[in-house]
Amino acid sequence: MEEFHCIDSNRLANAFPHPRLALAEPNGLLAVGGDLSPERLIMAYRQGIFPWYNQGQPILWWSPDPRLILFPQQLHISRSLHKRLRRGIYQVTLDLDFPGVIQACASPRQDGEGTWITSEMKSAYNRLHEMGIAHSVETWEDKELIGGLYGVSIGRIFFGESMFSKRPDASKIAFVYLCRQLQRWGFPLIDCQIQSEHLQRLGAQTLPRNKFLHWLHEFSNSPSLKRPWHFDPDLLKNSL
């Protein structure tokens, strides 16, 4: 019988087993317990591990195989999305309202379902943002936040966490601008974590976990960018 690892909250060093020990079913479940301290979260991301659990559950840590990733230069922009981008009716910013983005991502969806972003998760990622490790992209209509996404940056790897839209394509527009900026900064890939038809339509693809870990180990130790993040001015002026 396969078992997963229980993490001691009082122990940080060597807290996680190797991702290859993750369960096949449910795919990628590796460990349970611990905490969401910045140190533990950073350690987890560096090893290709992320937390994902629902309210009332213990903290669950995952490293699925295969892994969904997107190479920024292979981003697919549909004809309808391209048309909306060219119209330029929305404004896009970086790191302007991280708390607002994560709160919107945590809000119940239109279908009435809640999300996995608990108050504990919000507090943890807000701390990472204050440290310059977690970042947000915001899409605005006038002064209203209508879409966006947030994630974690370690070295030259961006780990996408969640996105939301209150208007058609608002989160996709945020994602397009993020991809273009990360491409300029030399980020080779975006970790999209688990399979998603929404992201696959934008060009995301699956990689075997061992190949993803190879990319991660090569680029997660690159120098991190200074905080806060900003889009290059010419990127915002030009049509994508």
From Swiss-Prot:
GO terms for molecular function: leucyl-tRNA--protein transferase activity. Keywords: Acyltransferase, Cytoplasm, Transferase. It is an enzyme of class 2 (transferase). It catalyses: N-terminal L-lysyl-[protein] + L-leucyl-tRNA(Leu) = N-terminal L-leucyl-L-lysyl-[protein] + tRNA(Leu) + H(+); N-terminal L-arginyl-[protein] + L-leucyl-tRNA(Leu) = N-terminal L-leucyl-L-arginyl-[protein] + tRNA(Leu) + H(+); L-phenylalanyl-tRNA(Phe) + an N-terminal L-alpha-aminoacyl-[protein] = an N-terminal L-phenylalanyl-L-alpha-aminoacyl-[protein] + tRNA(Phe). It is found in: Cytoplasm. SUPFAM superfamilies: Acyl-CoA N-acyltransferases (Nat). The keyword Metal-binding does not apply. One of its GO terms (biological process) is protein catabolic process. Its EC number is 2.3.2.6. InterPro entries: Acyl_CoA_acyltransferase, Leu/Phe-tRNA_Trfase, Leu/Phe-tRNA_Trfase_C, Leu/Phe-tRNA_Trfase_N. Gene3D superfamilies: Leucyl/phenylalanyl-tRNA-protein transferase, C-terminal domain (3.40.630.70), Leucyl/phenylalanyl-tRNA-protein transferase, N-terminal domain (3.30.70.3550). It comes from the Bacteria. GO terms for cellular component: cytoplasm. It holds the Pfam family Leu_Phe_trans. Functions in the N-end rule pathway of protein degradation where it conjugates Leu, Phe and, less efficiently, Met from aminoacyl-tRNAs to the N-termini of proteins containing an N-terminal arginine or lysine. Belongs to the L/F-transferase family. This is Leucyl/phenylalanyl-tRNA--protein transferase. It comes from Nitrosococcus oceani (strain ATCC 19707 / BCRC 17464 / JCM 30415 / NCIMB 11848 / C-107).
